[in-house]
Regions:
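Short, structured patches in soluble enzyme cores that scaffold and shape functional sites
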Residues: 27, 55, 77-79, 144-147
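C-terminal edge-of-domain segments
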Residues: 2, 87, 93-166
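Short beta-strand segments
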Residues: 18-56, 86-87
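A generic local secondary-structure boundary/capping motif
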Residues: 13-14, 64, 128-133
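Short, basic/aromatic recognition patches
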Residues: 1-23
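Beta-strand secondary-structure signal
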Residues: 52-54, 74, 89, 140-142
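Short, structured beta-strand-loop surface elements
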Residues: 59-109
Length: 166
């Protein structure tokens, strides 16, 4: 039976997810074959009740097909300097139209990710090439978070994050 209280991430996790960390998405299709694609930013709506990630339609073709079939999506947010990582899962994912401010969110994400990786020796042109996608190719995938996990390497990896708690 579904919970009467929707799952909510705490404000620290919401800030972390939108702060220039590495974002990767995954799904699976009819035969449970996985698909994966790097995301180009994240928007958190309605105090974390809805999450939108931005992908290249061309690069994410398999993942978008799988989301259309299964509606399942897992998103991993990882800070490269510290390896702090969280995973968010949802079962109602769908491709959505970009909102007017979404390209600006993607542009800000690219700049923040450059700043995150520069101290590790990655050049701005390299990071921008990694995140290259014309605005016309951007798509959004929105979902409701149902579960979240600590995926930081170590003894606590895989443990559930408590809804609404740090």
């Amino acid at each position: 039976m579904p919970s009467a209280t929707p799952f909510r991430l705490d404000p620290d996790h919401l800030r972390f997810m939108t702060d220039g960390v590495s974002i990767n998405t995954a799904s699976s299709g009819a035969q449970d074959l996985p698909s994966q694609c790097r995301a180009f930013g994240c928007r958190v709506d309605d105090a974390g009740r809805r999450i939108r990630v931005f992908l290249s339609g061309a690069q994410a073709a398999d993942l978008l097909r799988d989301v259309g079939q299964s509606r399942a999506l897992a998103v991993v947010f990882s800070d490269p300097p510290t390896h702090r990582t969280i995973q968010i899962k949802g079962r109602d994912a769908r491709v959505e139209r970009l909102a007017p401010g979404d390209p600006a969110v993607v542009a800000a994400y690219r700049t923040a990710f450059v700043a995150c990786l520069r101290p590790l020796g990655f050049t701005e042109p390299m990071v921008r090439a990694l995140l290259d996608c014309p605005d016309a190719d951007l798509v959004a995938v929105g979902f409701t978070p149902e579960a979240a996990f600590n995926q930081t390497p170590g003894a606590q990896a895989g443990t559930p994050l408590q809804a609404g708690a740090k």
